[in-house]
Amino acid sequence: MFLQEISNVQRVLVFGDSTIENKLPVIRALWKASESSLLLKTFLQQAIEIIQEETQKLASQEGSLFLHCINVLEIAEIYAEAEEPDEIIASVLALVARFGALVLDNEHNDGSRQSTGPIQIAGFCTGLLAGAVAACAKDIITIFDLTCEVLAISFRLVIALVRRSKAIEPEPGLWATTFIRVSRQELEMQLEDYNLYHNLPREKQAYIGVTSQLWNTVFAPPSVIQHMSESCPIFSQMSQVSTTAAMAVHASHLSLPDIDWIIGSLPGLNTPVLPDRSIISTSTGKPFLAATLQELLESIIADISMNLLDIDSTVQGICLQLDMARPVVISAMGPSPNIPALTRELANGGFKSKTLAVISGDRPRRLLPQARSRP
C-alpha cells in the first residue's frame, strides 16, 4: 500500500549512518529496484559520474578505486572482499544508498505529500546529509537535483574527515568500539583516567562520540582502540562490539573541517527548508534552525564532525514533534539500528506506528583491525 492510500498519517523518515550494514546487499537491492525505476536508474548513473568527477579533483590517491569501476554496484562488490576498512568507500556507498532510497520513495509517492501532512526527519551521522535533501525538496525533480548536488558535498565532507583522521594517525584500522551496558558518566571517568595515565596528546585521546542509555561508542586512533580493547584491563573486561568506523567523527576537540571547500557554490544551496519539514539535530534533540539548504548543511556538518550524537535525545526530539492523536508511519531509508529505539519511544508515548522499509540490507559486518603497537 502506498502512503497516499493511508489517511491522516504522520511520516517520519529515518536515514541511518555508514556503519550499519554490509554495503553490498543494500546496493544490490537498489540496483534491482532501478530496473523498474527510470529515475533511480538515472540517479545511480549520475552518482558514479559525480563520484568520479570529485575523485579526479583530488591530488592524492584517495578513492582511486572509484576511477576503475563502471558503476556503484561494481564498487560495492569489490569492497565486499576488502580486508581493511576504507571509510571513503564505505561512506560513499552508504550515502548513495540513502540518496537512492529517497529518490525511490519520492518516485513512488510523488504528489501525495499534502495528504500525509508534516514530515519529521531523523538522520544519524552522515544520514543527516540525505535528510537535508528531504527537508528541502518539494517534488521529485527537486529531489533528484538536490541529491546529485549534496552527494558531491557529502563526498568532500568524507574526504575532509578522513584527512583529519589520517593527520592524527595514518595507519588503517578502526577508529571506534562500542561499550555495552555501561553508563556514559562511568565511561567518561574511565576515559579521562586512561588518557591522563597514558599521557595521550589531545588529538589522540579517546572520547565518547555516540551515546545512548544502553551503549556508548568510543572513538580514538586505531592504535589506541586496539590497546583499550585488548590490553587495558578495565576496558577489555567490559562488554564491547567492534564498530565499523574508520575515521573520527563527533569530535569536539578536533578542528572543524573547511566548510567553504566542502559546501562549495552549487546552485541548489539557496533552496529553502520547507515549512512542513522538521529535521532533528542529533546533538541537541531539537529541530535545526535553518532557512536554506546551505544553512542546514553548515549545521549538519558541525553535528557530524564536532558534536556528540545523542541517540536518546534525538529519538525523544522526534516524538515531541508528533501529534499523539494521529498514527505514525516510519519510512526506513535503508537499514538503521536506531529504528527499534524510535518505535519503543513511540509506543511508550501512546503512539500507533508502522515501519515501512523503502530499501533493505544486511546487518553490519564486523571488521577487526590488524594488531598494532601500543600507544
Q: Over which residues does each language-model region extend?
A:
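Short glycine-enriched nucleophile-adjacent loop
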Residues: 101-102, 128-139
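Beta-strand elements of modular eukaryotic interaction domains
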Residues: 84-85, 121, 131-134, 207-208
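Conserved SAM-binding loop
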Residues: 122-123, 217-218, 332
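Residue-level signal for helical boundary/lining positions with a hydrophobic bias
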Residues: 13, 121-123, 246
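Gly/Ala-rich beta-loop-alpha elbow adjacent to hydrolase catalytic centers
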Residues: 98, 119-127, 131
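Acyltransferase/transacylase module recognition
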Residues: 1-118, 252, 256, 260-375
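Beta-strand segments within the central parallel beta-sheet cores of soluble alpha/beta enzyme folds
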Residues: 117-123, 147-150
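Alpha/beta catalytic cores of group-transfer enzymes, especially the acyltransferase/condensing modules
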Residues: 134-295
